[in-house]
């Protein structure tokens, strides 16, 4: 009873903080960056991280197993993974671009997970026999950590593409008036400065996208391999090509292609960012979209209206 009450308290606290953070982030986005608001949002993110950690711990105690058995629980763990990456980025103090991505991801994922939309899925039940294994923590946690890192890296690539293809403003190129000429040269100076800043920003986005996706790819690979071993123990086959396994393999292939393109200088930047952006969509199909189908060996993670 105490654990259940604590779980509800932590859920409401995390949802309240997330609601406040959304307001703060929107205020920072619509206006110039305000130092105090930014610091408040960062502290709020740290509090959210500890709240989600406490929520996972109370779930674990209350349910008797690590909370990764259905979509609702995995969404909470996904938001925790985003918050973990954000906390690491925050304490390194040189990855502001990554922090911006991870904070938004944490806010919206946790907000969705605790908003009540998934109320039907949040009803706790006894684990199905296939999930009553020590492999549950290793396989599912590594997969979701991999998804979180890959999603963050992909969003950095999406930002890179937006900045790259954004059209620059047109400047006066012909003017006999002294005032217009002066304005022209000033704008050329600003234009060159902006181009330099834009180039530096693109390079930084490309660098961090590569670093984060590389980390996520390692988690994804180990997660798939551990899942294959677990599948052999549970179902007698390492691979069954059910929808979740198939899309996980497609996700792995897409990001393997991304890492390959990063090895060639001619394909770095925009080309690799396009691949990562495709990967962003593939991950959501694998993680969320397949659950709408409710078919295959992983149907226990589906929406209640679609699983049999």
From Swiss-Prot:
Membrane topology note: Multi-pass membrane protein
Keyword Amino-acid biosynthesis in record: no
Keyword Lipid metabolism assigned: no
Keywords tagged on the record: Cytochrome c-type biogenesis, Membrane, Plastid, Transmembrane, Transmembrane helix
GO cellular component, one term: plasma membrane
MF (Gene Ontology): heme binding
Compartments it resides in: Plastid membrane
Pfam families: Cytochrom_C_asm
Cysteines paired by S-S bonds: none
Superkingdom to which the source organism belongs: Eukaryota
Annotated InterPro entries: Cyt_c_assembly (IPR002541), Cyt_c_biogenesis_CcsA (IPR017562), Cyt_c_biogenesis_CcsA/CcmC (IPR045062)
Segments crossing the lipid bilayer: 2-22, 44-64, 71-91, 143-163, 212-232, 239-259, 273-293
Record GO biological process: cytochrome complex assembly
Stated role: Required during biogenesis of c-type cytochromes (cytochrome c6 and cytochrome f) at the step of heme attachment.
Sequence similarity: Belongs to the CcmF/CycK/Ccl1/NrfE/CcsA family.
Assembly and binders: May interact with Ccs1.
Name of this chain's protein: Cytochrome c biogenesis protein CcsA
Native source species: Cuscuta exaltata
Gene behind the chain: ccsA
